[in-house]
């Protein structure tokens, strides 16, 4: 483990030993720095610019070397705003990649991309640090055990179950509920899981980051009285940060998670909200670094950058990282290069649909578009697999009949099709569920539904035992018993 040059002031104090350069050019977040002949820094080395701006304000900007240009020049991307920097300013090559604090000292704290605490709770113990650039675990170190990760969310557990130690993507356009779903998963899993979690806020709203922090304090995931007993480390690089920070903050969070997996041999949860912003930040600096844009203006290195991050998120024989990533889908187009590249790395995809969200069905998970490699009879068992397939078939038939219903109406359908439509509408509503984190909006207390209860509920609907109940009885309830109780209440109100 190296000492982190960006958080330990003493490491940069002896300038004589340091390799010094000067700023030659500043283009937004990208700097060109000239070094003496034969003293070029390596790719990914951290450079520090210290000094004062024209008004006398202290400047301390950390950059990361991206390209060696020739003529003793390097091109670097700044991790914070470049306001106040001028040509000719002195730049110090730290001689190492960016390193961040890791281990128990990170729990209960909020960090920026450089691993500096931003929660005003004092300094963090930086004796154990780790560089943010590492290679993925070797092939022989990987673990291949298959087991289900129960979330307590009906639609997920039944139709697209998550793999323990796998990678899960939540896909959706703007405002369909990705962050709320991630917060519910943190609430359900991080509390029940008992292990440690790392949350990487990549280019999302600062307000949401603050809400999450407050919620974690309320729920006890972050223990205010004894920070060391907290279960989560938070790393934020929000929308207002320069692209350099948004491009690297995911790696900072991942580095902290890797330490818990490799050294502490724990099972870790890694939440990333939002992985699309990682790609977006890369495309923002790509043109400034002189690369030719690829499809839809993305960086030509898109799949390489995504691969180098995703391949590190894996389960080894020491421990596992289960990663849940929100993926923003630009203009609801799943064929856009950013979500399309992400798809290739995932074990399960939970696709959020604007159509369901418009109907008021939350979580707005599309039961036909969402997929999982775990939905196989040998993994989940025959009963679960059969129920999931029958639910999908019923919903698919309903989808096919919708055009006929729109033109001719329900009365023109055969008796069998009318029954299918009635059951599909009940299933659609029963797939909705009140969330703990959304109690404020829905007014209904949150519900956690175990997998066995979920399967039983859908089997009862499919068998026809509940054909006599009104479909609104199935909307925003937990298990099937709540739906029957709600139906009785509705009957009572009618009388």
From Swiss-Prot:
Produces ATP from ADP in the presence of a proton gradient across the membrane. The catalytic sites are hosted primarily by the beta subunits. One of its GO terms (cellular component) is mitochondrion. The gene is atpB. Pfam families: ATP-synt_ab, ATP-synt_ab_N, ATP-synt_VA_C. F-type ATPases have 2 components, CF(1) - the catalytic core - and CF(0) - the membrane proton channel. CF(1) has five subunits: alpha(3), beta(3), gamma(1), delta(1), epsilon(1). CF(0) has four main subunits: a(1), b(1), b'(1) and c(9-12). GO terms for biological process: proton motive force-driven mitochondrial ATP synthesis. This is ATP synthase subunit beta, chloroplastic. Belongs to the ATPase alpha/beta chains family.
């Amino acid at each position: 483990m190296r000492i982190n040059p960006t958080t330990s002031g003493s490491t940069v104090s002896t300038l004589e030993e340091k390799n010094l350069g000067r700023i030659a050019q500043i283009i937004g977040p990208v700097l060109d720095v000239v070094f003496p002949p034969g003293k070029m820094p390596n790719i990914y080395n951290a450079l520090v610019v210290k000094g004062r701006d024209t008004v006398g304000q202290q400047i301390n900007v950390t950059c990361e070397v991206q390209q060696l240009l020739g003529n003793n020049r390097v091109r670097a991307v700044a991790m914070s705003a470049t306001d106040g920097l001028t040509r000719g300013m002195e730049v110090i090559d730290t001689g190492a990649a960016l390193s961040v604090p890791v281990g128990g000292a990170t729990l209960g704290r909020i960090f920026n991309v450089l691993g500096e605490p931003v929660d005003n709770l004092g300094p963090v113990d930086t004796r154990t640090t780790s560089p943010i650039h590492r290679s993925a675990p070797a092939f022989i170190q990987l673990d291949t055990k298959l087991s289900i990760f129960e979330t307590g969310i009906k639609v997920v557990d039944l139709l697209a179950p998550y793999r323990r130690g796998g990678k899960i993507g939540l896909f959706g356009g703007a405002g369909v509920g990705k962050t709320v779903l991630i917060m519910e998963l943190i609430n359900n899993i991080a509390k029940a899981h008992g292990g440690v979690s790392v949350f990487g806020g990549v280019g999302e709203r600062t307000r949401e980051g603050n809400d999450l922090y407050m919620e974690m304090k309320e729920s006890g995931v972050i223990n205010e009285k004894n920070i060391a007993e907290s279960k989560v480390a938070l790393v934020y690089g929000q929308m207002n940060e320069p692209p350099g920070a948004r491009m690297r903050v995911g790696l900072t969070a991942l580095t902290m998670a890797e330490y818990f997996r490799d050294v502490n041999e724990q099972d870790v949860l890694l939440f990333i909200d939002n992985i699309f912003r990682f790609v977006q930040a890369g495309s923002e600096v790509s043109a400034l670094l002189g690369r030719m844009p690829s499809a839809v203006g993305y960086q030509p290195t898109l799949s390489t950058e995504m691969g180098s991050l995703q391949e590190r998120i894996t389960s080894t024989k020491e421990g596992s990282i289960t990663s849940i990533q929100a993926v923003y889908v630009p203009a609801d187009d799943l064929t856009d290069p950013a979500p399309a590249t992400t798809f290739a790395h995932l074990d399960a995809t939970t696709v959020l649909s604007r159509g369901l969200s418009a109907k008021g069905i939350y979580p707005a998970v599309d039961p036909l578009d969402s997929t999982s490699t775990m939905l196989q009879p040998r993994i989940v068992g025959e009963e679960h697999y059969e129920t999931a397939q029958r639910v999908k078939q019923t919903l698919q038939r309903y989808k096919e009949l919708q055009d006929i219903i729109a033109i001719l109406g329900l009365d023109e359908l055969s008796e069998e099709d009318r029954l299918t439509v009635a059951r599909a509408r009940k299933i659609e509503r029963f797939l909705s569920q009140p969330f703990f984190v959304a109690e404020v909006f829905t007014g209904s207390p949150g519900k956690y539904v175990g997998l066995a209860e979920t399967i039983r509920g859908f089997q009862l609907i499919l068998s026809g035992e509940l054909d006599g109940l009104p479909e609104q009885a199935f909307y925003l309830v937990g298990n099937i018993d709540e739906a029957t109780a709600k139906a009785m209440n509705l009957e009572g109100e009618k009388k």
